[in-house]
């Protein structure tokens, strides 16, 4: 983009145009919890003024492997023994993982007593695989940062950021127009909603089949998608964008419920269906879509945990199921990177394509590789990042801070962390706009490839599997964490380089 050729006056004009477009198209956080005098307050989501330049081959590699990743994590979610083998031990030292694992066990016990017509075998995954473009003397390509299986965010507003940069190009705010490339047309909104809509259709077909077998007349209702959210949610526009797309394109109604109010849902024990009552009517729930629930603090009470179990046992399709949530833990990512683990689930070209994206990772246990990881953590910490099982940003420990953190905790707790080698991300320059004026930074980019999959956990049949667009986050090179909602990074779009 040759951003060094822009004058301060041009950057100021570009910043004003980008900021106005962002507000006009919902690229904002809402600050309902701090509104004053009854006013709603919105702040612009941090954005880049220019698209992020990503090597063509690296981007194609990341996009091409997404369907294999979708299938991989669906299979992991179905594999109780694999999850038990690698996760049960860390539940002793991680309260959140312990609670999730206990819910999973209780769900398995409850399912064993359900009648066939009360059991839901279908599951929905809305996934995001995050990468940085790694470069060394002999290699340039994508290395995976993490794989997310719950509450993947910014698929809604990322489409608007792509449109924002297109507007800047078409309206003359760039010195040189962007080159149109079909590969970077962002289908994040339609892609995610296609997956959710397919799950709704699968639910309808499944329920219709049940009623037909039992000679019960269908009630002809249109089941809904239920977004489970947190109170005072800031990222509303990202979520609402998906709701509007579901309604306008797929004619699927969505409703929202605070995780603290899950006990208001209605569970019909005879049919095992889930219902939501509003001031207007009562809706049958086809899909429960969690946009919260990935952190311990998200659950305000034991009742919220109990209701997640109740929902898990109903006929509604869950996104994600508890087993899919567990499959997305950092420990599973680390285990997959070890030799032979991946062969349990994939083979051939898919196996090789997925394996090529793995970064170097270590456990911190008493296995030979774990002992090697412990040695590296203390002797060469500057080459690594230490990751707990938690999602949401702001939880990692970097470089020289790693030995101090490990020294403060009992050694038996180290196994609940993984050690990951730094990805040598390709740097560039960009302007980040999150206040009144854009600021120029040396930056690195993280691309997140979105995917959706609907599958049958009893038969392993895949009903739908697709790559569903992308997001791009850009952060100052000196910043370790990469979360937009936590204030570390900004949203961008992608322009490809040869």
UniProtKB/Swiss-Prot annotation:
Any one Gene Ontology molecular-function term assigned to this protein's record: glutathione binding
Record: residues binding substrate: 128, 150-153, 233-235, 239, 291-294, 473, 484-485
InterPro entries xref list: Glutathione_synthase (IPR005615), Glutathione_synthase_a-hlx (IPR014042), Glutathione_synthase_C_euk (IPR014709), Glutathione_synthase_N_euk (IPR014049), GSH-S_sub-bd_sf (IPR037013), GSH_synth_subst-bd (IPR004887), PreATP-grasp_dom_sf (IPR016185)
GO biological process, one term: glutathione biosynthetic process
Catalytic activity: gamma-L-glutamyl-L-cysteine + glycine + ATP = glutathione + ADP + phosphate + H(+)
Domain of life assignment: Eukaryota
Residue positions, PTM Phosphoserine: 356
Residues binding Mg(2+), per UniProt: 146, 148, 391
PANTHER family tied to this protein: GLUTATHIONE SYNTHETASE
Protein name as it appears in the record: Glutathione synthetase large chain
Name of the gene encoding the protein in the UniProt record: gsa1
